Amino acid sequence: MAGGVTGGAAGTWSDRFEQGLHPFIEAFNASIGFDLTLLQEDLDGSIAHARMLASVGVITEAEAEQLVEGLETVRAEAASGSFQPGLADEDVHFAVERRLIALLGPVGKKLHTGRSRNDQVGTDLRLWLRRRLDGLDQDLQRLQGALLTQADRHRRTMIPGYTHLQRAQPLCLAHHLLAYVEMLERDRERLQDARKRVNICPLGAAALAGTPVPIDRQRTAKELGFSAVYANSLDAVSDRDFCVEFSAAASLVMVHLSRLAEEVIAWASEEFGFVRLSDRCATGSSLMPQKKNPDVPELVRGKTGRVFGHLQGLLTMIKGLPLAYNKDFQEDKEALFDAFRTTRDCVEAMAILFEEGLDFRVERLNEAVEQDFSNATDVADYLVSRGVPFREAYQLVGAVVRRCLEQGCLLRDLDLSAWKELHPAFEADLHDALAPRAVVAARRSEGGTGFERVDEQLQRWLQRFNGTQPVG
């Protein structure tokens, strides 16, 4: 038809259109600026598709070989920098197809038989995320390993424990660090579980209804390493649950990193003084020469909101979409890519911080647990062990703490006669029981902060990381 659209992606739309896109709309519509990230996955998917087409007789083996060679040529050109898609290509799929046709002529036009960009992009996204999930799992393990090394180093170091950011009870520092190891393990489990749903292949669903071409979906899925194919073609091209699920799991990773970052920020302050930051993981002030700023954990804390935002954006984008594919889905990629990269970078930054970026100030930590009333609960426990009802013991100790505050002293400063005046159950062994190290050691319940229990927890984790025993 005279006046039909030619060239670039628009040329692929057939002669249905008589006018080209407005230049601004062409740029607005294009995703090539960011979906080129999927190039390797797009090439992998196309190679598997070409081989499948030959296996069912839709194209010849010779044509499939040409297509595979052409696609590998595009891969090599991309590696060398000579493959340079432009705005007219619209997206990575058209860019590859255009180059393939330029390399192979009419044979290149056969690659898209039996598929649509709708199932193609869904396949690319899943391949991309599956590969990155495996790498992120290794990054999380690295951070766990850094925390375990610190915990192993501080089996007998104590640290104040807090509730409501008020001194509560003394803890073993290793116990505190192991809490984050446990959180990260749940993160790994969530991501591994999400991977199961990433690993389902939509290729072959075509635009929305399947295809009359006698394709073999199972063969393509197997070659690409998928565990299954989508059972419903509409669902296959409409599903972005896996993007949301990853972003939700990544958001929880960031929650845990942010909580740890917040503690490091506080610990590094002069008010706490629990850690010393190394020069390799801190910055200075442009005005105040005495400053050493905890930029790494501050950035992790700040970037957490960015990942949350991507999750909310994906949910909002998907919630009103009718079946099947809609152009709105173009917005899933930048959110997914950035949520992943931000999470990965924050995990790595925190791993480096705990590997070589901070030292715990043991003397300061051990001093800190001596300067408060965090052993008050142990006075109540002492009375309970001698038959005093807990609530009565609790009320008595509360009154003692108030008296100490009025007199400007600590519980350990009261002599035995003063304790005896309060209750006859107190004996000379009370002062030993109130020592912070004794307080920590007494927490022997399963999962508690008692040194022996922490040794058990730590040994279990170290064996897990040495590959000798699973964590149950």
Curated annotation (Swiss-Prot):
Q: Which family is annotated?
A: Belongs to the lyase 1 family. Argininosuccinate lyase subfamily.
Question: Per its UniProt entry, which superkingdom is the organism in?
Answer: Bacteria
Put simply, this protein is called Argininosuccinate lyase
Question: Where in the cell?
Answer: Cytoplasm
Enzyme Commission number: 4.3.2.1
Q: In which pathway does it act?
A: Amino-acid biosynthesis; L-arginine biosynthesis; L-arginine from L-ornithine and carbamoyl phosphate: step 3/3
Keywords assigned by UniProt? Amino-acid biosynthesis, Arginine biosynthesis, Cytoplasm, Lyase
Biological processes, Gene Ontology terms = arginine biosynthetic process via ornithine; L-arginine biosynthetic process
Q: Which InterPro entries match?
A: Arg_succ_lyase_C, Argininosuccinate_lyase, Fumarase/histidase_N, Fumarate_lyase_CS, Fumarate_lyase_fam, Fumarate_lyase_N, L-Aspartase-like
> Which organism encodes this protein?
Synechococcus sp. (strain CC9605)
Question: Which class of enzymes does this protein belong to?
Answer: lyase
Kindly list the GO molecular function terms attached to this UniProt entry.
argininosuccinate lyase activity
GO cellular component labels: cytosol
Q: Provide the reaction this enzyme catalyses.
A: 2-(N(omega)-L-arginino)succinate = fumarate + L-arginine
